[in-house]
Amino acid sequence: MKAATLSEAGVSREILVIGSGFAAQQLVKSLRKLDAEQPIRLITADSGDEYNKPDLSHVVSRGCTAAAMTRLSGSDFAEQQRIALVPHCPVLGIDPARRIVMTVQGEFAYGQLVLATGASAARPDLPGSEQLVTLNSQQEYAAAEGPIQQARRILVLGAGLIGCELAMDMASDGREVTLVDLADSPLSALLPAVLSQPLQQALRSQGVSLQFGLGIARIDAQPGDGWRVTLTDGRTSEQDLVIAAIGLKPNLVLAQAAGLAVERGILVDDSLQTSAPHIFALGDCAQWRGQLLPFLQPIVLGANALARTLLGTPTPLTLPPMLVKVKTPRYPLQLAGRTKGEDLAWQCRWNSHGLVAEARAEDGELCGFVVGGDQMSAAFPLLRQLPR
């Protein structure tokens, strides 16, 4: 294995990245654009293959296999970016004082360390929930690909962004889909209920059974294949597959064991540095200014800023107003800014095929917006009006 390059002081010059998801690979690309020679090592528990994670919400309608999602193998990515890749190598711990990462394949020294450990799919607190399908990675899809392709009756637990995308995608392929959420409407963390009504209508028009204000009380494996699912109102149904899409939980175990400050995520400052010197965090695992930002655009901007910082030019992360896109083809949505809050006054324009909803503060300033259906072209003009 290639040894780490040492500085004159005997400290490794290597930038070591733990993880191989979008954040890790985007950081590698950003570093390479700025410096063709900087030693970089990426350690990952999987193969390190590059794929497009948002495609996971649409694999059924596209008939896409897990293998076909791979854009570039880990070894090809490493060769292309001229980095040292250590695949299939779980990390056991971090020693910040010695600047050492301990793994199943031995110890690796670092000059700067980046935690890009991502987040894991949350599961309901129920017996047997570990057997539910989650689709948070290519590996998870590969493990469940057979049951997903064969299932006719599918229950999706969670009507957030991913849950709605999955439900519509699977229904468009002729599956019998039930969408369950404790909230009274879909996308409840993003939208007022009234603005989700066209999306609800679009889901129903594709045959999705919407069960809001309800959770799952019990999941029982059936003889042979399938599940008997009991909702919190006592009703039961037979399902071939149950998918949990109730959010993400940042992977914090390594950071906690190393003594780094954590809350919901790994706490970072504006330079994305953790509470320990020479250790940074990026992506779904990081908590910046009190926020978790599990979206692609802030990760790209974070990777660009962090690359400059790691190469000697301190660059604080600043985020402009950013679009969140809900890829539900029968009724797509885009939103940005602040779209939840009792203090917001909404100005809405509806037609039979779309909506433009503007959220304004008491002084009339635009705070956020939602566009839906055939009104997508209104998104960017409104985005430019949001305060930066």
Curated annotation (Swiss-Prot):
It comes from the Bacteria. Signal peptide: none annotated. Its cofactor is FAD. Keywords: Cytoplasm, FAD, Flavoprotein, NAD, Oxidoreductase. It is found in: Cytoplasm. It is an enzyme of class 1 (oxidoreductase). It catalyses: 2 reduced [nitric oxide reductase rubredoxin domain] + NAD(+) + H(+) = 2 oxidized [nitric oxide reductase rubredoxin domain] + NADH. One of its GO terms (molecular function) is oxidoreductase activity, acting on iron-sulfur proteins as donors, NAD or NADP as acceptor. One of its GO terms (cellular component) is cytoplasm. Pathway: Nitrogen metabolism; nitric oxide reduction. Its EC number is 1.18.1.-. The keyword Metal-binding does not apply. Belongs to the FAD-dependent oxidoreductase family. One of at least two accessory proteins for anaerobic nitric oxide (NO) reductase. Reduces the rubredoxin moiety of NO reductase. HAMAP family: NorW (MF_01313). This is Nitric oxide reductase FlRd-NAD(+) reductase. It comes from Aeromonas salmonicida (strain A449). The lineage of its organism: Bacteria, Pseudomonadati, Pseudomonadota, Gammaproteobacteria, Aeromonadales. The gene is norW.
